Amino acid sequence: MTSQPQVRHFLADDDLTPAEQAEVLTLAAKLKAAPFSERPLEGPKSVAVLFDKTSTRTRFSFDAGIAHLGGHAIVVDSGSSQMGKGESLQDTAAVLSRYVEAIVWRTYAHSNFHAMAETSTVPLVNSLSDDLHPCQILADLQTIVENLSPEEGPAGLKGKKAVYLGDGDNNMANSYMIGFATAGMDISIIAPEGFQPRAEFVERAEKRGQETGAKVVVTDSLDEVAGADVVITDTWVSMGMENDGIDRTTPFVPYQVNDEVMAKANDGAIFLHCLPAYRGKEVAASVIDGPASKVFDEAENRLHAQKALLVWLLANQPR
């Protein structure tokens, strides 16, 4: 079987150029204001939504969003298909491409996407892998635009500063670096030694920052919170790491996002968390339940940003 390099997929944050990312974010705002204004899946046409990892927000937001676009979500978990059980991912993608308009997948190894992309003739969407979580970043950027750049739109993100505290060696930190740098935002990963991002992801973010003017910083110093417009954290123990034998609590205690940390940020700074959150662990209840917190707007924006992404991908495939 031949590869399909011309198909536009969204497997990583840098699969969109800065201009394309801005287009998606602008469309997301439109779809939030007019949820049923785009119906590219009218028919209904189908989208495969595949889960190797369990989810709440990903499943509900994609299922509802596909319905809003006029389509039908075929939701399948790993226990009810042959994926990874003898049939190759290449064969699976080739077959599914005959049935559906797009494939959305939440999986473990990021390399799985590259295997499916070899034969998929429809767009693949990474709804989460061990390396990256690019759909979440689109929702976060939409939330930041709403709160910090409502008049300018995505263009107003340029020069804003975001800081992420906690485990810097996970998919969220990787995507924040690349996705925010794509938007022209300065992004700082504040994490203890031994839990900082891998060089390959820092380099990808820096490369994108060279295009947009964004600065990428990796440090263990909380002083870096100064000047932040956005403060972000994530769970200290990501899914699948519960029993890896590594102490994922003690090193992160100094990096909890609490009132003291928020006081270091700019006046009017907002707090984001992709959820689920553990109050008293990575974030104090006073922060996540306080006025700076936009976590539920952020969760809602998964719906709108992912709809915009699907509309954009379906409209930008080779004819």
From Swiss-Prot:
GO (cellular component) term, any one: cytoplasm
EC code: 2.1.3.3
Pfam families with a match to the protein in the record: OTCace, OTCace_N
Top-level taxon of the source organism: Bacteria
UniProt pathway: Amino-acid biosynthesis; L-arginine biosynthesis; L-arginine from L-ornithine and carbamoyl phosphate: step 1/3
Chief location bin: cytoplasm
GO BP annotations, alphabetical order: arginine biosynthetic process via ornithine; citrulline biosynthetic process; L-arginine biosynthetic process
GO MF term set: amino acid binding; ornithine carbamoyltransferase activity
InterPro entries hit by this protein: Asp/Orn_carbamoyltranf_P-bd, Asp/Orn_carbamoylTrfase, Asp/Orn_carbamoylTrfase_sf, Asp_carbamoyltransf_Asp/Orn-bd, Orn/put_carbamltrans, OTCase_ArgI
Cellular compartments annotated: Cytoplasm
Catalytic reactions of this protein: carbamoyl phosphate + L-ornithine = L-citrulline + phosphate + H(+)
Disulfide bonds: none
Positions of L-ornithine binding: 171, 234, 238-239
Record keywords, A-Z: Amino-acid biosynthesis, Arginine biosynthesis, Cytoplasm, Transferase
List of residues binding carbamoyl phosphate: 55-58, 82, 106, 133-136, 274-275, 302
PROSITE patterns, alphabetized: CARBAMOYLTRANSFERASE
Function: Reversibly catalyzes the transfer of the carbamoyl group from carbamoyl phosphate (CP) to the N(epsilon) atom of ornithine (ORN) to produce L-citrulline.
Similarity comment: Belongs to the aspartate/ornithine carbamoyltransferase superfamily. OTCase family.
Protein name: Ornithine carbamoyltransferase
Organism whose genome encodes this protein: Corynebacterium glutamicum (strain ATCC 13032 / DSM 20300 / JCM 1318 / BCRC 11384 / CCUG 27702 / LMG 3730 / NBRC 12168 / NCIMB 10025 / NRRL B-2784 / 534)
